[in-house]
Amino acid sequence: MAQLFHPSSNTIAKAIIVGGVLGVPTLIGVGYAVNMSYGYQVFKPIEQPVQFSHKHHNMDDGIDCRYCHTAVEKSTSAGIPDTHTCMSCHSQIWSDSPELAPVKASYVSGQPINWNRVHDLPDFVYFNHSLHINKGVGCESCHGRIDQAPLAMKVHTFSMQWCLDCHRHPEKFLRPKEAVWTMGWKAGDAGINPDTGKKYTQIELGTKLVKEYKIGHERYLTDCYTCHH
């Protein structure tokens, strides 16, 4: 009987089967990631009464995060500056801009601006900004390159799984306290590891900082009570 199919057909058939087996989980994984990002409103700019640009103020003008977020090193909340802080500059700069009309009105009336929350954690989750800052967690680790953001938005899901990834392996994320505010920081910026004679890797430096900053054991960091109380 004459051969109906070319010998290469077997290879093609196997490739289709393997592609189907591997492709379906891949599609499911991609779909799950997209759904998670959408559900958690990741990369979605939030409309505000005043379109404040972190990029303009931080990257372009070099204003330190703590000039506006004054409580971040000692309070559970980073804090939103009142309009007195805004007007300390804008009474002299861009004072006639229509964009600043709500800021000026708030300053005169004493009524705060009703900003729309960007990072809205569930009511039953406890998060302490000062604790993370003082343990070497950089702003960038949670807020991404906020210095490059014309409009504020979430860049991570802030899901429990996302938090646990850090709590289980803090050495992957820690940096020296003085570098907490430095955007684009890399472990190699910390200098030479005397044990290797080479620039620090993140794991080398992070492991050192876990001990130096007395970071709790994974068992404590992943205990329900640590964040839910």
Where is each model-derived feature located?
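N-terminal Lys/Arg-rich, disordered targeting/topogenic segments
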Residues: M1-N10
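Hydrophobic membrane-insertion alpha-helices, especially the h-region
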Residues: K14-Y32
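Sequence context surrounding c-type heme c attachment/ligation sites in exported
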Residues: I46-E99, N128-H229
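Extended active-site neighborhood of metal-dependent phosphoesterases/phosphodiesterases
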Residues: E99-P102, N114
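Short, solvent-exposed interaction modules
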Residues: W115-I133
